[in-house]
């Protein structure tokens, strides 16, 4: 089966086939990958439990598909191009052969440090090639990687290490991000005070930040590599895995409490990311593909590492941020490396658009043939700017909708093949069966309708469980509507049948394309000694898409609001990370609560949005007077 669809008629045909014969369809896609042993059963599923098994009985190692199988034809082709934070530092390039050598080397390092198949390894590294090497080396030895984004706090790392019982941590002395140096090793040291399971920490040299190395626990990456080199760099045969063995855990925010560890498995995830990458981006061999995400998020896992490498692509990764040294940095990278495909977030597009067109002018972007967006719905203005200024009206925009839990793209245009409309994710990819339902789970049929977006049939890339807590997986995704996977997103299907994602329908915010649970932020704010209670909602933000608005009841009457605001932001940064800091903090004497004590977030959301004319029925509130006070305070904050 050809992984790439070449016309709209073919899309309709393949889509129909994939929905009517899902097992045959996915088996044909899977045949294009390398398996040590084939499956005896393509799919076994039940959304009630939930139980999802793809390619049962099959044996493989994903790294043989991402590296070994390309060596004969593509050994000297660049696999990874790395662009550093500082434009004056040299870039690095690793061919498929070089990447395989380095992955095998580091697989030996992991083994030498006691890592066995099935062990969990926490990775807290900057965006450097060693991050890709560490991820693939874990997969090669059969260990489960849990990558933590370099912007998370010590507390967030400790929670993730303890939840997964990680034996080993891979980190760096520090990381560069714009003008900042982030002291990653020191943050890990703070985290590990709370972690009993960690036996070893491997530390990469990047920033030369002074760090303390704990004897018997901490070792340098470079020293460990030297040991393997003195043994003559032996090969490292990949560990044979079952298709349903765990590949990685990635933590994501939910509407309640602590982040949950989404589990993806070896076989299905490989097939799904490889297929969706090849098809949606219509990747042609020799193209340079640049995804600006961080590997600490699912986009980096699926569309910097596993998807592109499984297809023999050249994947460009960038250590820095789009706005440093100035807002032309991404376009300098495109110009320098003759990038063909750019995949970035609407937040980045909006901030670059706001900086002004002078940063685009004079850059040679003629190599670009395809563009993509990810992380949140894109507004029409940003879509048009991206299309005109970056794609010069010639590069189709693939506006992709998917989630950490889905493993890969679900609803998305296929570049140059299916139509595009600004702000629309358009049509489901083959094998994906979306359905809109009302509050009671009744299907909303026809077009020009809106509802809650669910998926009614499994696909190979979907999550299998939440680590150590299968019941939470069932409750979060499979209990709202019977026999459906509930996405947590609202959706509009227009008269032509195209899908537009309208945003979360639960208590989860999408800030700069990052998912943050309101409960998480509230819990962090409430840790501040001067805070009695808080409620957090989202509001429209010109750059981030959604901003974080916190309503806070402070103890005592004489609060220095500005000082307390700074303190609260520091508290949130310390507990979660800087990405969760509220954009607005409003002090209030009370919160709108029902008689049963439930906070009416709907009302707070409207006030935060500035939509105070129609707050709906407030008669059920315990103290309706508090609403007027909050409205007045919100006006003041705006002014």
Model-derived features: where do they sit?
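Conserved AMP-binding/adenylation subdomain of ANL enzymes
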Residues: 268-288, 298-340, 355
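Conserved AMP-binding A3 loop
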Residues: 91-97, 239-240, 247-271
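Gly/Ser/Thr-rich phosphate-binding loop
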Residues: 222-225, 313, 340-344, 353-422, ...
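AMP-binding/adenylate-forming catalytic core of the ANL superfamily
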Residues: 148-174, 188, 335, 342, ...
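Conserved ATP/PPi-binding loop(s) of AMP-dependent carboxylate-activating enzymes
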Residues: 427-431, 442-477, 516, 612
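AMP-binding/adenylate-forming catalytic domain of the ANL superfamily
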Residues: 200-205, 543, 574-599, 611-637
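Conserved AMP-binding/adenylate-forming core of the ANL superfamily
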Residues: 63, 80-136, 153-158, 213, ...
């Amino acid at each position: 089966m050809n992984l790439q669809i070449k016309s709209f008629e073919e899309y309709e045909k393949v889509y129909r086939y994939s929905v009517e014969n899902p097992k045959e369809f996915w088996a044909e896609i899977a045949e294009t990958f390398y398996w040590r042993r084939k499956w005896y059963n393509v799919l076994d599923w039940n959304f009630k439990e939930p139980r999802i098994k793809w390619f049962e009985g099959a044996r493989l190692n994903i790294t043989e598909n991402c590296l070994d199988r390309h060596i004969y034809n593509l050994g000297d082709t660049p696999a990874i191009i790395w662009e550093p934070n500082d434009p004056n530092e040299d870039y690095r390039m690793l061919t498929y052969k070089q990447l395989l050598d380095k992955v095998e080397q580091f697989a030996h390092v992991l083994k030498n440090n006691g890592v066995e198949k099935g062990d969990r390894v926490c990775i807290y590294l900057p965006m450097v090639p060693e991050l890709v090497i560490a991820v693939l080396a874990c997969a090669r030895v059969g260990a489960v990687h849990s990558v933590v984004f370099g912007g998370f706090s010590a507390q967030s790392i400790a929670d993730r290490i303890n939840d997964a019982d990680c034996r080993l941590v891979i980190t760096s002395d520090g990381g560069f991000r714009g003008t900042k140096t982030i002291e990653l090793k020191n943050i890990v040291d703070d985290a590990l005070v709370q972690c009993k399971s960690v036996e070893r920490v491997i530390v990469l040299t990047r920033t030369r930040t002074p760090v303390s190395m704990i004897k018997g626990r901490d070792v340098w990456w470079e020293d460990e590599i030297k040991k393997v080199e003195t043994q003559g760099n032996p090969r490292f045969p990949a560990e044979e895995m079952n298709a349903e063995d765990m590949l990685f855990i990635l933590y994501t925010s939910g509407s309640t409490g602590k982040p949950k560890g989404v589990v993806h498995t070896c076989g299905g995830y490989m097939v799904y990311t490889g297929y969706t990458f090849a098809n949606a981006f219509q990747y042609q061999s020799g193209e340079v593909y640049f995804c600006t995400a961080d590997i600490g998020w699912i986009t980096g896992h699926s569309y910097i590492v596993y998807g592109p490498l499984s297809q023999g692509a050249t994947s460009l990764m960038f250590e820095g941020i789009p706005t440093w040294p100035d807002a032309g940095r991404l376009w300098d990278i495109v110009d320098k490396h003759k990038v063909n495909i750019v995949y970035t977030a609407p937040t980045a597009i909006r901030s670059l658009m706001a900086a002004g067109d002078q940063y685009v002018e004079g850059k040679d972007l003629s190599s670009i043939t395809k563009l993509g967006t990810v992380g949140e719905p894109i507004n029409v203005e940003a879509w048009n700017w991206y299309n005109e200024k970056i794609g010069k009206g010639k590069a189709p925009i693939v506006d992709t909708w998917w989630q950490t839990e889905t493993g890969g793209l679900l609803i998305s245009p296929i570049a140059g093949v299916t139509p595009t409309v600004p702000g629309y994710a358009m049509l489901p990819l083959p094998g994906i069966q979306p359905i809109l339902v009302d509050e009671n789970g009744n299907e909303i049929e026809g077009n020009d309708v809106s509802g809650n977006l669910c998926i009614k049939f499994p696909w190979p890339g979907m999550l299998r469980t939440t680590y150590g807590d299968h019941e939470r997986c069932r409750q979060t995704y499979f209990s709202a509507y019977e026999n459906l996977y509930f996405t947590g997103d609202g959706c509009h299907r227009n008269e032509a049948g195209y899908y537009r994602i309208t945003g979360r329908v639960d208590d989860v915010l999408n800030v700069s394309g990052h998912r943050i649970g309101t409960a998480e932020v509230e819990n962090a704010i409430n840790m501040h000694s001067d805070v009695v209670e808080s409620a957090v909602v989202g509001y429209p933000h010109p750059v981030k898409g959604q901003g974080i608005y916190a309503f806070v009841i402070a103890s005592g009457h004489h609060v220095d609001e500005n000082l307390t605001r700074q303190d609260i932001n520091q508290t949130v940064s310390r507990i979660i990370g800087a990405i969760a800091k509220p954009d607005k903090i409003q002090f209030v004497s009370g919160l709108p609560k029902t008689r049963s004590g439930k906070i009416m977030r709907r009302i707070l959301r409207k006030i935060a949005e500035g939509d105070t004319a129609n707050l709906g029925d407030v008669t059920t509130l315990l103290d309706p007077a508090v609403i007027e006070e909050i409205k007045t305070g919100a006006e003041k904050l705006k002014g």
